[in-house]
Regions:
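Short, solvent-exposed coil/turn linker segments
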Residues: 34, 55, 60-61
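Short glycine/threonine-rich loop-to-helix capping motif typified by GTGT followed
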Residues: 41-57
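Long, distal/terminal scaffolding or interaction modules
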Residues: 1-33, 39-40, 63-305
Length: 305
């Protein structure tokens, strides 16, 4: 990678040193002792005159530079560390302890749990422990297999590595499988539901954003921006919203239904198989549309089965 760039890392280091030095000189002239003291000092900023530039002369920053009255007792910068309440997450309260034998000794773990939409990034902390111990290789397939029932919160299964399998009977919010890194995610409607899965939204927007490896099976329709920047996962879904497979560079996506507008915009790699393809919805700037050949049909059968 470095061969593609000219210069040396030391050049960047020198640049940052010079920026810091110049900043200190400016602060000294203003009588400011630290960067923290600069926070909120709108009185030190003014709009530079650009009368000789037609476009810039029409820019008015008065509202941006307006200095509202703030009582002295109110802090104008970071004062209190944000409490992310990690100890209340499903991973910290249950899953890490439950999956400890798998993480430490690679012993298979099977469990079934209820989930609701306040349970966010479920599986991510467990996955981070797996990656910390075993690196990119992860665990043997299905070492950790967790079945959930309910409505999952945002980022369900985000970044989970190889060896983790999450199965959800229910639905999920946005960012499902974000950054998937080798794991497997399966989502299907409640077994008692009476609606048609291929006609109803089961997953929110931006599912599998930036996913690099793994597999996903969604028995339902997903929202917008599905598999954006996918570079290696294999996903089967029954329909998706606008901007599907945007900037995709690798992997496979099988759509057993309809697609939304602007499909495959900026897609430079990978394969997408679409059952009900309206060519008007496909951005053909970088992709080629063609009927499935025998090899494609064989692969599609493998994915469906």
């Amino acid at each position: 990678l470095r061969a593609r760039f000219t210069g040396k890392p030391e050049y960047v280091e020198n640049l940052m040193i010079f920026i810091a030095r110049e900043l200190r000189e400016i602060m000294a002239r203003l009588g400011i002792r630290s960067v923290a003291e600069l926070v909120g000092r709108i009185d030190l900023v003014r709009q530079k005159s650009q009368d000789d530039n037609f476009k810039l002369s029409r820019v008015d920053l008065k509202r941006v530079l307006f200095h509202p009255y703030i009582d002295a007792s109110v802090g104008h910068m970071h004062m209190i560390d944000q409490d992310h309440e990690l100890e209340r997450t499903l991973d910290m309260s249950k899953l890490l302890r439950m999956c400890r034998p798998a993480i430490e000794d690679q012993k298979p773990i099977r469990a079934k749990l209820a989930i609701n939409n306040i349970n966010r990034v479920v599986g991510t902390l467990v996955g981070s422990e797996v990656t910390r111990r075993y690196g990119e290789s992860g665990l043997p397939d299905n070492t950790i297999k967790l079945n959930f029932e309910g409505s999952a919160g945002q980022s369900f299964g985000a970044f989970i590595p190889k060896g983790m399998t999450l199965e959800l009977e229910g639905d999920a919010n946005d960012y499902l499988g974000k950054g998937l890194s080798g794991g497997t995610i399966t989502v299907y409607p409640p077994k008692k539901s009476i609606f048609e899965a291929d006609e109803n939204i089961l997953i929110g927007n931006v599912a599998f954003y930036g996913a690099t490896s793994g597999t996903a099976y969604i028995n339902g329709v997903v929202g917008e921006r599905f598999a954006v920047r996918n570079s290696g996962i294999t996903a089967v879904v029954e329909g998706l919203g606008d901007h599907g497979c945007e900037y995709m560079t690798g992997g496979e996506v099988l759509v057993l239904g309809k697609i939304g507008r602007n499909f495959a915009a900026g897609m430079s790699g990978g394969y997408a198989y679409i059952l009900d393809c309206d060519e008007r919805y496909v951005n053909t700037g970088l992709v080629e549309l063609r009927p499935a050949n025998n090899d494609d049909l064989k692969r599609i059968k493998e994915l469906v089965e």
